[in-house]
């Protein structure tokens, strides 16, 4: 046992991308910079643990405020009883944020407690959950927000230099020729393409019919395989996901926006994904991701962690 002595939020801002990059112009109205939201938990033994919540990328001051709200309910309590502290956080937040923003801050604190406990025990975080059956995890390059062929080639060259064999691009239904060209060009590099349609950001999102028409049009131009379609319809369009999975011979995936294990498990039971994408910095922390992994195995659905935050969120998902 080691009591929690202090909890503090840390907001960081860093340069990100180039001011003329299409992603910056479309998604970052404040210019080429990104924020992340971290939590530092200090135990009475002096060990500090760090966690991250994805909310800090989008609403850093909201992240900070919720952490400050929750901290007094945890200080002085056992920092090693992580599941009990998780329940404490749920007691504070679930009435007004059963889903959504507070789940991200709960994630951050849970990750920080895992970090502090593993540091105290002088072991990698994953050993607190048992062990690992793998000694490495394959990654893919996430990009493809490009408006010129030269930009795509620049990203493909970078992936080749890093030995990365999979490349996720962003596309929507009017990107037929662009998608077909990238599929052909990537084959020259021995790189496979997955497509993120980003419909968790769209209102209204596109329909399953739109997606099917888009894919069929691409296939008329290019015979290259598409590895997966991510968030191809809106996050609440359960029937749309099912239709895509039943109609297209492409792996259908999603789930990065889901903020509770219960909702993710319900989706697994509905068999709407070929693989599912929980994020420890969103869904309630590392124990929540493990819960999703365990249920996914019973359904023979592959879990693939999502991480688009900072290094703490990436490492939490890695473990």
Task: Pin down the residues of each PLM region.
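Conserved, mostly hydrophobic/aromatic
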Residues: 46, 70, 109, 122, ...
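Structured beta-strand/loop patches that form or line metal/cofactor-binding pockets in enzymes
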Residues: 1-45, 54
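Active-site mouth loops of central-metabolism enzymes
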Residues: 136-151, 170-172, 198-209, 253
């Amino acid at each position: 046992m080691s009591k929690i002595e202090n909890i503090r939020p840390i907001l960081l801002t860093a340069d990100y991308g180039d001011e003329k990059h299409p992603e910056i112009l479309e998604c970052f109205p404040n210019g080429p910079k990104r924020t992340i939201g971290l939590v530092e938990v200090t135990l009475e033994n002096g060990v500090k643990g760090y966690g991250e919540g994805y909310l800090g990328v989008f609403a850093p001051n909201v992240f900070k405020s919720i952490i400050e709200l929750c901290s007094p309910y945890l200080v002085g309590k056992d920092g090693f009883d992580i599941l009990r502290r998780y329940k404490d956080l749920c007691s504070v937040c679930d009435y007004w944020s059963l889903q959504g923003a507070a789940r991200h801050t709960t994630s951050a604190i849970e990750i920080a407690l895992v970090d502090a406990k593993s540091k105290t025990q002088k072991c990698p975080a994953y050993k607190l959950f048992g062990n690992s059956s793998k000694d490495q995890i394959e990654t893919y390059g996430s990009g493809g927000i490009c408006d010129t062929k030269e930009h795509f080639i620049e990203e493909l060259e970078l992936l080749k230099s890093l030995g990365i064999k999979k490349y996720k691009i962003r596309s929507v239904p009017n990107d037929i020729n662009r998608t077909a060209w990238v599929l052909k060009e990537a084959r020259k590099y021995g790189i496979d393409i997955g497509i993120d349609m980003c419909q968790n950001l769209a209102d209204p999102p596109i329909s399953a019919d739109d997606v099917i028409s888009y894919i069929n049009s691409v296939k008329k131009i290019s015979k290259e395989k598409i590895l997966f379609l991510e968030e191809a319809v809106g996050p609440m369009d359960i029937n749309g996901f099912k239709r895509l999975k039943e109609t297209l011979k492409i792996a259908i995936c999603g789930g990065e926006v889901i903020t509770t294990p219960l909702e993710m498990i319900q989706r697994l039971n509905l068999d709407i994904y070929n693989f599912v994408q929980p994020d420890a910095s969103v869904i309630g922390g590392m124990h929540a991701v493990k819960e999703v992994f365990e249920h996914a195995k019973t359904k023979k659905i592959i879990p693939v962690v999502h991480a688009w935050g900072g290094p703490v969120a990436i490492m939490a998902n890695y473990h």
